Amino acid sequence: DAECSVGCVYTKMWNADYYPEGCPPSSLITLNFGATKKNNTPMQLTWTDGGIRPPHPEIIPANDDIGGPGSYNGVLMIGEKGIISTNINDSSPLTPKLYLYNGETEFGPETEKMPEPEYGHQRKWVDACKAGFNSKEHLELTSSFDYAGPMTETVLMGNLAIRSYMLRKENAKGNLDFFARKKLLWDGENMRITNLEEANQFVTRQYRKGWKI
C-alpha cells in the first residue's frame, strides 16, 4: 500500500492550486510491503524530497550528517540491531556508516565504481538484448529487468499516491472536497488500486496513434 503528503502552492487564501501537469514542490511518501518468502517480516519504505528531512535518529549523534554531506541525498536503513546511513545519487563513492543500538559505530570502506564500457550502462543493455536471455551479458547487468521492473513499479506507486492527492470534487456548499487523501491499496497481480477507482486513471494511458507497443 502507499500513502503520501505533498506540499501545496497557494495563490488564493485557503485554496490550494492544482497543477496536474507538474510535480508538487515537496512530498513525503510511505510504502508498506508485506512479508514474503524472501523477507519474512513486513517492511516500510519512506521517501522524502523537496527539502523535507526525515527525523534524526536518536542513536546518530546530532552533529553527524544523515545520508550524504549536509544530510543531502541519502538513505537510512533501519534494522533490529542498528541503522546504516549512506550517501547516494551522486558521483561520489558510497560511504556507509553503521550505528548500532549498543552504542558502537562502524565506518564502511568507500565503494569503488564498477567499470563501465563506452556509452555506459545503455551499451550494456543493448549488448544484453543482442546476446539474449540468461546470456553472460544479461546476467552481468547491474539493473536487470528481474528486479528493475518491480522496483519501477514501487516508484510509480508513489507517483500514483502523489497524483491522487490533489483530486477534488465540489460539494453542495461550493467548497472542494479532497476525497483521495487516503492509503491506496495496490493489487500488483492485476495492476490496479482496489480502494479508490479514480486513482486507476493514472495507472495507464491512451497512447497516441502510432505509439502503441
Where do the language-model regions lie?
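Glycine-rich, aromatic-lined ligand/substrate-binding cores of catalytic
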Residues: D1-S144, G149-F202, Q206-I213
